[in-house]
């Protein structure tokens, strides 16, 4: 009985639930054959087992990010500082993140993006709580040692303020969700995108990768040996052994079966290292988690999250100011995350209607999180996008499964409490590797522009340096900003401490105020003024594919005709289908860019910008 030879089969997404397969390049001659693409690939049929395996690893990254955010926000919480178990607060965040993820992948941006709390929500929350709750002080002899002032008694005056402070943070999250949803409903991304080139996106991604280095170092410092072991295992599995193909067992008859080889090490580059280091950490007992957050509590086994479970969010002028800064920073971060995910999956750039829907549903998720009492909103997760790059595959089915996992775990606070035992070195190692991928993706975007230009060198350097300098200055300034009005102080301190927003804002202003040619800015050097018939066909095919991948699902698409005119920015336009334009004869060249290259369409500009 002869057996078919072993050979790897590229994993292409099939069916409605899977992520789009990689699109062909806009112009074949411009493709660099020597470059290694970060294409979305699936090895063999996308089985449910493989999807569950990938979803479990994305869930581990999400759980690490979620638990790290709660640790940073509640690290000064005295025993008894909350009127409910901290595990219940974590379960509420799991539920809101899961529901937001399902909505985002179903009718939002349609990209396989996981929704999670981001640094853009954490920074204003820390500013809001620290300004109102000075529960920690620094000892004269050791500037790095923080002592809780109210850890020995539950009758301290500051303890009853914790619930009020967290209610105020939840109110800020609700405000941010409402504002972010409004930004999406008004179609702001479609109006801003034509003015955003590689010199706006690249600094934002670089700063996004660097912005969490302090928190990552804090988690890794709990045990540098375990953290370095985790990082080493993740790098070896995803990079050094990433191309090792292992045959997948098949239950079909050998005469008709095709033996599929899959890169097991790359597909397990998160689960295997995390499980190994978690086991070692439990064996040696190095998990250093605050007792008030990890001790066994009376959290229920089953709990149905609903608004007003503890108390309703508190809306104050300071919460309003913090919520505005959250919305501006989270919107900037999410738009960069959309572009990064499309770049890693080798897709066409997300169209304005997909970005508008994505921001609208992220705002809805943040409103839901705030109403459920969560102190952190939901936004597209950069660490999970970095995980997509490690796996080199992305799937909407995987994102749906992650959302369902989170919603199921959010119904059981007792099960959610299990993830409070994640060791700190694991948190630091996972976030460190995934953030490094985001950083490298930002650097890879510089090649689209003329990086040797003095104009571009100044824009890149100034945007990145000032985005990292201003938050550091605010954090260590001897005198805080004091305008005499507390809400304005809160707004300035929160917004100026958001590095991703600062990088995007500075890059946007400098890019559009300093004169430069389109080729110098990276907006037109790859787009010729005329195309052959074959190139026209490929361009139309690419547009049709983009319309298929970013378009609304059929039940929702049929309702577009009933949507009021001001909300038509959420629906695909007729020209997005790619059917416009006549056919050309073989060898004929058609001018798609009349009036020279200075006036080509927004879609073409975005296509060039994301290549």
From Swiss-Prot:
One GO biological process term: hypoxanthine transport
One GO CC annotation: cytoplasm
InterPro entries: NCS2
Region Disordered, residue ranges: 574-611
Catalytic activity: hypoxanthine(out) + Na(+)(out) = hypoxanthine(in) + Na(+)(in)
Top-level taxon: Eukaryota
Membrane topology type: Multi-pass membrane protein
Major localization listed first in the record, in broad terms: membrane
Ranges in the topological domain labelled Cytoplasmic: 1-52, 110-168, 213-215, 291-319, 380-397, 450-455, 511-611
Compositionally biased region (Polar residues): 596-605
GO MF term list: transmembrane transporter activity
Keyword Transmembrane helix: yes
Sorted UniProt keywords: Cytoplasm, Membrane, Transmembrane, Transmembrane helix
Annotated transmembrane regions: 53-73, 89-109, 169-189, 192-212, 216-236, 270-290, 320-340, 359-379, 398-417, 427-449, 456-475, 490-510
Compartmental location: Membrane
Side of membrane Extracellular, spans: 74-88, 190-191, 237-269, 341-358, 418-426, 476-489
Family of this protein: Belongs to the nucleobase:cation symporter-2 (NCS2) (TC 2.A.40) family.
Function: Acts as a sodium-dependent hypoxanthine transporter. May show xanthine-hypoxanthine exchange activity.
Protein name, UniProt field: Solute carrier family 23 member 3
Native organism taxonomy: Eukaryota, Metazoa, Chordata, Craniata, Vertebrata
Gene that specifies this protein: Slc23a3
């Amino acid at each position: 009985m002869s057996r078919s030879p072993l050979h790897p089969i590229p994993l292409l997404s099939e069916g409605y639930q899977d992520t789009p397969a990689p699109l062909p390049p806009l112009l074949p001659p411009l493709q660099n054959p020597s470059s290694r693409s970060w294409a979305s690939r699936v090895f063999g049929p996308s089985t449910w087992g493989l999807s569950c395996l990938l979803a479990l690893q994305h869930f581990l990254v999400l759980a690490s990010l979620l638990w790290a955010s709660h640790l940073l926000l509640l690290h000064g919480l005295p025993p008894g500082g909350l009127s409910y178990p901290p595990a219940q607060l974590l379960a509420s965040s799991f539920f809101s993140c899961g529901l937001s993820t399902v909505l985002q992948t179903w009718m939002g941006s349609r990209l396989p993006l996981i929704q999670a709390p981001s640094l853009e929500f954490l920074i204003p929350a820390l500013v809001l709580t620290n300004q109102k709750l000075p529960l920690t002080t620094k000892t004269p002899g050791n500037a790095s040692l923080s002592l809780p002032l109210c850890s020995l008694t539950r009758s301290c005056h500051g303890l009853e303020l914790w619930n009020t402070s967290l209610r105020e943070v939840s109110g800020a999250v609700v405000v941010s969700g409402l504002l972010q949803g409004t930004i999406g409903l008004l179609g702001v991304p479609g109006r801003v995108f034509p003015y955003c080139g590689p010199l706006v996106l690249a600094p934002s991604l670089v700063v996004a990768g660097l912005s969490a280095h302090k928190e990552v170092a804090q988690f890794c410092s709990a045990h540098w040996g375990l953290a370095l072991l985790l990082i080493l295992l993740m790098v070896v599995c995803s990079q050094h052994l990433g191309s090792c193909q292992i045959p997948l067992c098949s239950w079909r008859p050998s005469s008709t079966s095709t033996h599929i080889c899959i890169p097991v090490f790359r597909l397990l580059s998160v689960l295997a290292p995390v499980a190994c280091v978690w086991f070692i950490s439990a064996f040696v007992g190095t998990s250093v988690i605050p007792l008030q957050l990890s001790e066994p509590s009376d959290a229920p086994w089953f709990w149905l999250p609903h608004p007003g479970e503890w108390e309703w969010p508190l809306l104050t002028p300071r919460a309003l100011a913090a919520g505005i800064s959250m919305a501006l920073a989270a919107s900037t971060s999410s738009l960069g995350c959309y572009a990064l995910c499309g770049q890693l999956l080798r897709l066409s750039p997300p169209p304005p209607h997909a970005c508008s829907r994505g921001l609208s549903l992220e705002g809805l998720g943040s409103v839901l999180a705030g109403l459920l009492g969560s102190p952190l909103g939901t936004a597209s997760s950069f660490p999970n996008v970095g995980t997509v790059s490690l796996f080199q595959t992305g799937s909407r089915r995987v994102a749906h499964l992650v959302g369902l996992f989170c919603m199921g775990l959010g119904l059981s606070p007792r099960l959610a409490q299990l993830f409070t035992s994640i060791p700190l070195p694991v948190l630091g190692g996972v976030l460190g590797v995934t953030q490094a991928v985001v950083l490298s993706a930002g650097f890879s975007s510089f090649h689209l522009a003329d990086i040797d230009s003095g104009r571009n060198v100044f824009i890149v350097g100034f945007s990145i340096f000032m985005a990292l300098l201003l938050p550091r200055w605010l954090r260590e300034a001897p005198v805080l900003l004091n305008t005499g009005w507390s809400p304005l102080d809160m707004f300035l301190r929160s917004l100026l401490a958001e590095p991703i927003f600062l990088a995007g804002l500075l890059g946007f202003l400098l890019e559009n105020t300093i004169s430069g040619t389109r080729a110098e800015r990276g907006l037109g050097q790859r787009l010729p003024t005329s195309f052959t018939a074959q190139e026209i066909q490929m361009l139309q095919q690419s547009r049709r594919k983009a319309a298929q991948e970013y378009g609304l699902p059929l039940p929702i698409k049929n309702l577009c005709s009933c949507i009021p005119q001001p909300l038509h920015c959420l629906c695909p336009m007729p020209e997005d289908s790619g059917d416009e334009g006549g056919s050309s004869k073989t060898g004929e060249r058609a001018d798609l860019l009349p009036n020279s290259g200075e006036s080509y369409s927004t879609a073409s500009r975005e296509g060039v910008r994301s290549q």
